[in-house]
Amino acid sequence: KKKIRILEPSVGIGNFIPLLVEKYEDKDEVIFDLVDIDNNSFVVLKNILDKLKLPKKFKFNFINADFLTHNFNVKYDIIVGNPPYKKLTNNQELLSLYKFNARNNETNNLFSFFIEKAISLGNFVSLIVPKSLINSPEFNITREILKEQNLLKICDYGEKGFKGVKIETISFLLETSIKKQSESIVIESYITETVEEKRKDYLLSDKFPYWLLYRNEEFDEISEKMKFDIFNSFRDRQITKQITKENGKYRVLKSRNVGNNEVKELENYDCYIDDTENLAVAKFLNRDDVVMIPNLTYYPRASFLPKNTITDGSVALLTLKNGSRLPTERDLEYYGTKEFERFYRVARNYGTRSLNIDNNSVFFFGLLKDID
């Protein structure tokens, strides 16, 4: 096309504009519709654009509005940007409006609403979003929506997306208007420094609870040893330092207390609690076969929850969910092996921060098939 229309839904000070200008300098006309809710951004952005002294064929429209509620009557060739990553919690009325227009109303996170609206308005859509999109339960529906489009590429920046910001990000590129989907997808990774083309039905397989960008033969071989989807996961949200003390009736275990089939005593670390009456985690007290796994770690290890103890939010508690056999110490020992660690890194998409053990990721703590 000689004339193209580009929408940037949350333009800020226009970081992507110089790159887009360079990419499409061969076009006869490029119209940018630049949207931002913050008018101050436009003051800075207009100054920057003046200094760039761009040819007349680049036209800019400034739309000071909320992208999610603004009515657009144009279909865009390209939608590109970096939507806000934040949960809307303080304005229920606005949140209800956003959710009313969205298929995924199980999240309060703005970037998910941005993805859906961008797909409805553009032919090609590319957004930089948090990596939790790939695996978090709250984005299960968003991933389904993305799979319905023709996904062309996912780029995993790890923590390298934004200087000085400790957040893991990815970007995706998709085409919305195609009848036949491509069978493969390109995965570019700044973590492994690789660019690979793989089959979509392999990486985005319904066999697993979320997308596995780094799935490989070794992962598949290890998968064959285990039966998955065994446990539910629970994490406490109530226990804080305000309610624990140095000694008391029940010991409160934290992540560093959990070893490989052992519970460690740690000086100046252990804490206790007397009253568990109003704590949700109390339902696990003195139950058999509750498995503890530290929450945010690359080095999984597990042990059974001992008598007269509970855990804080740094430990996930796993309980059987579907009439499987009981876990044994040998199963738990396997979670601490180098082999399982390699498997788990792939299962967690080489994440460093989005490592919560939730009801999606707990799927991968399987039980060994060779134990009956």
Write out the residue ranges for each language-model feature.
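Flexible, charged surface loops at secondary-structure boundaries
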Residues: 1, 72-75, 120, 244-247, ...
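Conserved class I S-adenosyl-L-methionine
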Residues: 3-10
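Structural motif
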Residues: 5, 78, 290-291
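Conserved Rossmann-like nucleotide-binding pocket used by diverse enzymes
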Residues: 7, 33, 63
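Signature of N6-adenine DNA methyltransferases within the class I
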Residues: 10-20, 29, 36-42, 54, ...
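Conserved hydrophobic residues forming the short capping helix/wall of the S-adenosyl-L-methionine
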Residues: 24, 49, 53
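Conserved SAM-binding loop
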Residues: 45-46
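Polybasic, glycine- and aromatic-enriched phosphate-binding surface used to engage nucleic acids
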Residues: 217-372
